[in-house]
Amino acid sequence: MIIGPALTLAALIVMAIAAPWLGTVDPGALDPAARLRDLSPEHWFGTDLLGRDLYSRVIYGARVSLIVGFTVALLASAFGILIGVISGFSRWLDPVIMRIMDGMMAIPSILLAIALVALTGASMRNVIFAITLAEVPRVARLVRSVVLSIREEPYIDAAIIGGAGPIRIIWKHVLPNTVAPVTVQATYICASAMIAESILSFIGAGLPPTVPSWGNIIAEGRMVWQIKPTLIFFPALFLSINILAINMLGDGLREALDPRLPKER
């Protein structure tokens, strides 16, 4: 179950990296005389309202989506692990940290991201920051549960008796046990971040309109979707394939890394 999604995701990553060579023209090049062109050898996906080549914009959109998704997954995992470990080992900080995490999780992540972007402004950095902050509680609670499950294990007591300090215990016994669940969770966060970025851009609260993100392309195409449905179809198709591949990869990793799940024969 992992191979297919992994190959699909690898193809999208290659496409994003090779966007300058795969794109037929500059994704931001305007040509008013060529606006709303149909599919042709010159414009494989046609052109948009401003005469920009849709194929090139969709290709570059993969780069934007993957950068946001991977960066948010990495940052949310790092900060979530740190907060989760501190909460799991500190009996007096744990209630405070968990109430903060519960409060953040009580707010829908997309609404929290919209509020943060509205306060900080629309840019790639601010969008990544806003989505990361909304996703950190998911990792923090997961890591805390792992820490609580192993904190009372006999080998932890043996390590303490043997003179191991907190840092050594965390590094040698706690962090290795968080790798599998956090890796799986990171794939879901990556997909969630891509969807959040697309939603933010679609409603005008995300990346600037000049950035060729899939959300921006869909937002621009919705005005003429009845006469030019391809302006929405192609970016939505690539976004759907991307999200589906990452979620299926996460499911495959969960089945492979979680010994409690029954294995497929």
Each predicted region: which residue ranges?
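Hydrophobic alpha-helical transmembrane segments of membrane transport/permease proteins
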Residues: 15-50, 203-211
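Transmembrane-helix boundary motif in ABC transporter permease subunits
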Residues: 19-22, 68-102, 114
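Glycine-rich helix-loop "coupling/hinge" segments at transmembrane-helix boundaries
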Residues: 105, 116-121, 131, 146-147, ...
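N-terminal signal-anchor/first transmembrane alpha helix
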Residues: 1-28, 100, 179
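Amphipathic cytosolic juxtamembrane alpha-helices at the membrane-cytosol interface
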Residues: 52-67, 71, 91-98, 148-152, ...
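Generic hydrophobic transmembrane alpha-helix motif, especially the helices
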Residues: 44, 48, 88-89, 93-150, ...
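Loop-to-helix entry region at the N-terminal start of transmembrane alpha-helices
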Residues: 55-69, 118-138, 230-239
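C-terminal transmembrane helix and the adjacent membrane-cytosol boundary/short C-terminal tail
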Residues: 133-134, 180, 184-190, 229-265
